Amino acid sequence: MGLKIFLVASECVPFIKTGGLADVVGALPAALKKLGAEVSVLIPKYSMIPQQFRKEMQHITDFSIQLGWRNQYVGVEKIHREGIDFYFADNEFYFKQDYVYSSGDFEAERYCWFSKAALEIMQKLDIVPDIIHLNDWQTGMIPLLLREQYSALPEFSRVKTVFTIHNLRYQGLMNPMLVNDLLSLGQNALAQIEYYCNINCMKAGIIYSDAVTTVSPTYAKEICTPRCGETLDGLLRHKHIAGILNGIDKKLYNPWTDKALCSRFSKNQPQGKQKCKSALQTALGLEQSEERPVAAVISRLTNQKGLDLFRAVIPGLLDLGAQLVILGMGDAEYERMFADLAAINPSSVAFRAEMNDALARQIYAGADIFLMPSAFEPCGLSQLLAMRYGAIPVVRETGGLADTVIPYNRFTDEGTGFSFRNYSADELYNASRAAIELYCGDKAAWQRLTARAMAADFGWSRSAGEYLHLYKTLKMN
């Protein structure tokens, strides 16, 4: 019998997604299962989960838990897919909204409920894992509750916890009086996770978990420095942080079988990519041109993603002949910026303020270049998907971008993309210009570069093996 892993998170594909966390939680269990582990997953039952999945759910049990002065309902639904049990913690008061995340005291209460419900669900369903694998601040209180209130129970006495930091910037700050009222924590525990007169859920996960990981080797180093540590670098320097690179689901993201594309292609049969480019230009109202490179951005529109650099860079890229496609939602200032650019340059710039998976795949497939100049990037999945679909990434050397994109060397004809070091509009422009000039000036070299990028293997098998090794090490200790 393999190791039993209980993976707890706030989102998971294909059920609900706002970012890369969902992709990881959706793909890692299957990769671990292939290596012999027994994996189950728990997320909240959001009202936004599509009806097609809600119809699959089987009601397992329901009960009440004490949360502050209230008894709160906990329902448990289950979907069994490809040998993995996906559980959904149900409470309509907390999760029947038209959003996944919010802010303020209600957000704190939602995930306090979810944290306590997760441990109670394991008890009620007799799930006794070897490892509870937790993800980001929404689950950070679980290892604290486990140690303070559940560790004396026989079923939890030997359980180990792994806490993965997907993005250190979002830490889950809560009112101490509210947290104490909801979870009845002792003053010592509250003092341990105090953060400038707040309670910090990310800090709780880091302190109380048996092992802490993050999603790339470079990001693991960066968050231990004041520049990237989001004021927790001092704490992180006293923990061993394992940097395990995220992967992508190669079966789910495959340009040879992707039904969202008008034509299939692969590194050995790349002809269909040009058809995808032509279809994208037509669909978005861009000038039909094989010679003009299409540069794409698919991103949350926030300052983390380096979007302020584009203000100075985009006019120069258009002067070089590039077309620009942007897909994403976020801060109003960036939505206005890209909407204005598209209105002024309708044959060269297209902007869609939406989250559309099918369109994203069509953009990856139709783009020649993928721009990702992040201020910081814990891992990044977009550059991996871009390479998978033959779009050459132009990235800043930070976090997982530095770990996954090999800079192009025109003398040795090696590399899988273009990169720049400093957070600078000039450096972004120069790296983008190098990509555009290679595309326009040396088609043979570009085709070889594209083939290398598409051949790069960022599947989950290697990363799952690293997680499994960590789990086994924890269990033996």
Over which residues does each language-model region extend?
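Catalytic cores of nucleotide-sugar-dependent glycosyltransferases that transfer UDP/GDP/TDP-activated
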Residues: 1-477
